[in-house]
């Protein structure tokens, strides 16, 4: 590959930009403490995981053997026997959510998808693409789904087979919908467990809850039917990706044979990235579960540090249990743009991913926010 001098200069400028901003993502859940340099040589090859990793494929350059290892690992941490599960490495959380909703729709074709107003924006797009009826549920103050409103709307709609989209960590507040509460409330109105579907969006918290002492309900053992997690968030990856796991019996409903690749098609994407499979495989093989627990504990400790610093000066910051997302009042635009914060309405958040090994970047942000919010308060009082 030969680039013109102008293009070489342009790409060099972008390289320096990336170096400058590599760790400057405190408002978004991307862990940057990774090193996949041992895998760089594989970028010489077009590795394509089209089809089902558990079957033979006539496309020789695939990483199916590694994908099998990845899926066995996630079946274990999401508490489902490997032989009863199936899933794959996706392009990201949205594809995983679509896969879960697709399975639910095939199981209950005429049912409604219920999700809270704090759910990730992609669910609206998914419902449109899958031509599913959908219903937005109110949220509690902490971002959890409003269980009373959920049951009220299911009863109002006379829904016999609701499809529940549960958040295992909402985008803005890290709130976790109570899987067990949802099942209890549905049982109270006479809906049997076999008559509804629960998909869990665990994009960030799916790699937190398995490694804390007192996790909220999140797994197949707690009653879910499918779950997805992002690979580029808590795990960390230079390429966005994700993992989705479902019950094999439900996946078999959508599976079809494809003759020209000699394998079965049961994924959303046809061609799939075989390199991200290698990244996820290396990530899970290079750390023990004890090391993951220690990494998560560090992130949680940093999150609590941020809450304490804000609260010490009277700023009402908070976080949900087992969450590394710290919520606080939205500062002025020049502050949230300076620190690349995610904002929604009158709130902003910071996320203490694992590359924050000390408090320097957190302190820099908090100092600016304190100065900004306290200055705004003084200006309001003076006026």
Curated annotation (Swiss-Prot):
Its cofactor is pyridoxal 5'-phosphate. Substrate binds at residue 120. Belongs to the group II decarboxylase family. NCBIfam families: PRK02769.1. This is Histidine decarboxylase. Keywords: Decarboxylase, Lyase, Pyridoxal phosphate. GO terms for molecular function: histidine decarboxylase activity; pyridoxal phosphate binding. It catalyses: L-histidine + H(+) = histamine + CO2. The modification N6-(pyridoxal phosphate)lysine is found at residue 233. Its EC number is 4.1.1.22. One of its GO terms (biological process) is carboxylic acid metabolic process. Transmembrane segments: none annotated. SUPFAM superfamilies: PLP-dependent transferases. Pfam families: Pyridoxal_deC (PF00282). PANTHER family: PTHR46101, SERINE DECARBOXYLASE. The keyword Lyase applies. It comes from the Bacteria. Homotetramer.
């Amino acid at each position: 590959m030969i680039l013109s001098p102008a293009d070489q200069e342009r790409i060099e400028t972008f390289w320096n930009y990336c170096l400058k901003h590599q760790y400057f993502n405190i408002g978004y859940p991307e862990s940057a403490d990774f090193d996949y340099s041992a895998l760089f040589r594989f970028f010489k090859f077009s590795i394509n995981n089209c089809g089902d990793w558990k079957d033979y494929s006539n496309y020789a350059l695939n990483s199916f053997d590694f994908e099998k290892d990845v899926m066995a690992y996630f079946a274990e941490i999401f508490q489902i026997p490997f032989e009863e599960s199936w899933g794959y490495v996706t392009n990201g959380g949205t594809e995983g959510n679509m896969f879960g909703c697709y399975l639910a729709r095939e199981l209950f074709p005429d049912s409604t998808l219920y999700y809270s107003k704090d759910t990730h924006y992609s669910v609206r797009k998914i419902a449109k693409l899958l031509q599913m009826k959908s219903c937005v549920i109110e949220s509690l103050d902490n971002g959890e789904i409003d269980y009373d409103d959920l049951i009220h709307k299911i009863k109002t709609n006379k829904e016999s087979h609701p499809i529940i989209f549960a958040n295992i960590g909402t985008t803005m507040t890290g709130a976790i919908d109570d899987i067990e509460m949802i099942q209890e409330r549905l049982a109270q109105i006479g809906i049997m467990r076999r008559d509804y579907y629960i998909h869990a969006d665990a994009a960030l918290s799916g790699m937190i809850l398995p490694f804390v002492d007192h996790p909220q309900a999140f797994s197949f053992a707690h009653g879910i039917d499918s779950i997805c997690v992002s690979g580029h968030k808590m795990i960390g990856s230079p390429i966005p990706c994700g993992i989705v796991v479902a019950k094999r019996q439900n996946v078999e409903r959508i599976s079809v044979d494809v003759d020209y690749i000699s394998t079965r098609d049961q994924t959303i994407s046809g061609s799939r990235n075989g390199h991200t499979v290698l990244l996820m495989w290396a990530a899970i093989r290079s750390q023990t579960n004890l090391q993951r627990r220690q990494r998560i504990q560090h992130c949680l400790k940093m999150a609590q540090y941020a809450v304490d610093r804000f609260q010490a000066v009277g700023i009402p910051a908070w976080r949900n249990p087992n969450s590394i997302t710290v919520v606080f009042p939205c500062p002025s635009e020049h502050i949230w743009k300076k620190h690349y914060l995610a904002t929604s309405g009158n709130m902003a958040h910071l996320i203490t991913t694992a590359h924050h090994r000390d408090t320097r970047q957190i302190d820099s942000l908090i100092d600016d926010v304190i100065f900004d919010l306290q200055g705004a308060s003084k200006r309001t009082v003076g006026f």
